[in-house]
Amino acid sequence: MKNEEYKKLSINEFTKAAGRYESNHAGIYEMCKKDYPDILAELEKEPFRELLDAGCGPAPMISLLAEKYPDRHYTGLDLTPAMIEQAKKKNIPNATFVVGDCENFPFENDSFDAIICSMSFHHYPNPQAFFDSVKRCLRPNGRLILRDVTSDNKILIWLMNTLEMPLANICGHG
């Protein structure tokens, strides 16, 4: 599957899931709460003012971080407009949400002190493009905090990239 085809599939499947992504059945918010302590521990090592959540979905991680650090600014980026609509409904006053591609950040150079990417990296068909965007948009001494699933098994990766989203929409995300 070509990169653009995969991105269209992602948008289609995550649009279907957007309204129920954080429901009790889906468990995404609970999964984010499990990642949150590790991400928070990394963020607490160095101060930050501007944070990007790449692949933010409906912004469960930004919601948690904004409660802890209400004096910081957060930007959420997601490819799926319906996910950004859900994030905006949370009315987080110190957050901005942008529809865009995590393989080509729509931001100025040196925009962020920290970039987090939690459980979305495996959906990026061109990982190097993501890292190039991170390098361009991180300020000097900025940090990338990346949490995701991984495997060396090419069949498992293919199954995850091809079947995960349609199955998750049938069975529930999380």
Q: Where in the sequence are the language-model features?
A:
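Conserved class I S-adenosyl-L-methionine
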Residues: M1-E46, P60-L64, M83-Q86, I145-A168
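Local beta-strand N-terminus motif with an aromatic residue
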Residues: F48, F112-D113
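Class I SAM-dependent methyltransferase SAM/SAH-binding core
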Residues: L52-A54, P58-N104
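A conserved beta-strand element that flanks and buttresses the S-adenosyl-L-methionine
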Residues: I116
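Short catalytic micro-motifs in class I SAM-dependent methyltransferases
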Residues: M119-S120
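A short glycine-rich, Lys/Arg-flanked "PGG" loop and its adjoining helix->strand segment in the class I
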Residues: Q128-P140
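Short alpha-helix
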Residues: G172-G174
